[in-house]
């Protein structure tokens, strides 16, 4: 990216040079990159190409499990996370049969900058950053909601040099990856899930004002300037106009459904608060929410047993702050259990301790 604008925040066809001056994708003679393999050309570094290549590789394989970076403290990792969300928002609208298990993980906190604890009996993932002494976890990722996998035996050897991950790290000629192995190799692997079964993605959404398209684009946050404000999620927010007395959202589903849950994401700006929302269903059922989570994380609204409906109306009855609004609405009839997927690793069966708990009580 350039020093002034990240590729993710650039206009679609603008060519953005990398730090080392490259303006096109590249690989090696033996291992050409995706664009060369698929199209026979190197792709210019533009936002449009970046997005289209990510979409093309997903469409080529339609993986049932998709693993990507999360809200990492690295601008390129964050850009990838946001772009994958953007692409998935389109794919989930275009193909009603595609509901992958989406798992996101941080690469720095707890991994690249994790504790050097390979030889510790408590060698499990903690979201600590040894480089700056923080234990940052993004508010959208609740530590107690993490999904943990147990690593196979070849990834937990008594000697580091026999570990298959260490052997793989030794193959890299840059980044000194092998020197970081004692930090990023753990007995568990930790991810956060983004469900993909929401009925909202193909729903018609109308609002009394503001940009309704933000409410079902799969992006629960967005950033207008990754380089200069990486942790400022100030974009992609439905904000009703100040003169809007209704502050209303009407969701019309493709077909009637027995709604079980509604997930709402509030504008993460700490000065913007939604105190209460009135939700009216097409079958006559009405519920009122309390305050939404103010950190931008999902607020889960449990819906009582009721008849099928295809209409959901939400009215912001009490708000605080001129930019109070929502980044996403998810409506669920069902969410597939993670055990129903063909998982590559066994789930961690121990009850995970809360972040910051007593390490001596861990199962290792």
Label each PLM-derived region with a short phrase.
Residues 286-304:
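Extracellular carbohydrate recognition and processing domains
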Residues 3-204, 210, 341-350, 355-358:
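Metal-dependent de-N-acetylase/amidase catalytic core
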Residues 315-322:
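Short beta-strand-plus-loop segments that form exposed binding edges in beta-rich domains
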Residues 261, 311-313:
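Short, conserved beta-strand segments of beta-strand-rich sandwich/propeller modules, principally
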Residues 193-256, 265-276, 293, 328-364:
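Disordered, acidic Ser/Thr/Pro-rich linker "stalks" and the adjacent N-terminal cap
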